[in-house]
Amino acid sequence: GADIIITGRVVDSAVTLGACIYEFGWGATEWDALASGSLCGHILECGPQTTGGNFTDWELAGDIANIGYPIAEVAPDGRFVTTKPPGTSGLVSVGTVSEQMLYEIGDPQSYLLPDVTCDFSDVTITQIAPDRVQVSPAKGRAAPTHYKTCLTYADGFRAGSYLTFYGARSTSKAESFCDAAVKRAEA
């Protein structure tokens, strides 16, 4: 029930990066390792977007009402394999992982995060088996000294959200998403 939460600089991918720092003992200036852990977190942070939930070729993902959430198997050098739980629908492919890697990053050679500035331009994404994609380590350099901020407060307003769908078959994609959302709500 806190009214105000004050933190250091935080970002979605930090949950994964923190686990990697703990597990592998990465130091605060091991820029390539930090960039690789951040990339792994970025691939996981939007859940089933990586497993085909918002993929350009969305029809290949199958029954998105039962889509599997992504899993990362991370190596100490920062490379990782992205997969999903067996028996779930969805798709882990070079396409799904690549689209998520580029999602909301701005400049792929200078993706600014609180712990590191990431360069994803030399990352290699390889299909190694069905629903198993290996991602090579990223490059990193020191974090920026300034960063954006976000502040929210309650002031009597309520917000709503819209989802947009683009592409040649956007109407079908939107209908598929709606059907899946209803199925999951009724489950």
Language-model regions: role of each:
Residues 1-7:
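An acidic, phosphate/nucleotide-engaging active-site surface
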Residues 2, 13, 35, 39, ...:
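General structural feature for long, well-ordered alpha-helical segments within catalytic domains
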Residues 7-18:
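Short glycine/serine/threonine-rich phosphate/pyrophosphate-binding segments
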Residues 11-12, 50, 87-88, 154-156, ...:
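Short, glycine-/Ser/Thr-/acidic-enriched flexible segments
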Residues 19-30:
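A glycine- and small-aliphatic-rich helix-loop capping segment at beta-alpha/alpha-beta transitions
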Residues 29-33, 87-91, 164-172:
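Hydrophobic alpha-helical scaffolding
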Residues 32-139:
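A conserved active-site cap/scaffold subdomain adjacent to cofactor or substrate pockets
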Residues 136-187:
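C-terminal non-catalytic interaction/assembly regions of soluble proteins
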